[in-house]
Amino acid sequence: MNTRTQKYIAEVLGTFILVFFGCGTAMFTKANVVATSLAFGISIIVAAYTFGKISGAHLNPAVSFAMLVDGKMKTDEFIGYVISQVIGAFAATGILSILVACGALGKVWDVKKGKDITAGIGDSSFGANGFGNMNFFGALLVEIILTFIFVLVIINVTESEDEGTKKHAPIFIGIALTFVHLLGINLTGTSVNPARSLAPAIFAIGATDGSSIAQVWVFIVGPMVGAFIAALVNSILLRKKK
């Protein structure tokens, strides 16, 4: 097995872990802010320590895009990473949909319709993102800012000249993902990751009356713009010149 194939497999598995536990927790706790934030943060720590030495554990097209802009990836490798991340996200959401079909959200008998309906202990929207009470510009701005901060942290801790910081980079990245979720969940549900948003948006079409797929472009464009700005700011303003 060649190194590039191993990287792609690592990205599939790492993204699966992130989406399965992050979006799964959002579903089964009705998007409890603290629980969901911690689930995403801890998941990325676990995935980064597990797969970081193989692929760098991007687990996110926005992160890979920042690396492409920064000159750390070639275009063909970037495309392979993104495809792998999307596959991992869809696999995780697919498993969550099977759990829902098996009654993981509980079942309530609808007397009027005369059938079981999913209800009760969770939310069947698969952790899909949405505009909340904002318009598209507000949601887009939130995603750009949150992704900018998140990706800027990733670039700097993984490039740090301090060995202690670099060694524990997954922990800092996990903390960063946790705190952007603490703010963002009540605004957009927090994406900062196009793959994490695309899969739930498609699976949640029925539960959201189509709004999840109609709004998903914001959660693709916003994170990519935020990542681009982060790579640019780091390159121009923060990186030490040799």
Segments and roles (model prediction):
Residues 1-242:
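Membrane-interface helix-loop junctions and terminal tails of multi-pass membrane proteins
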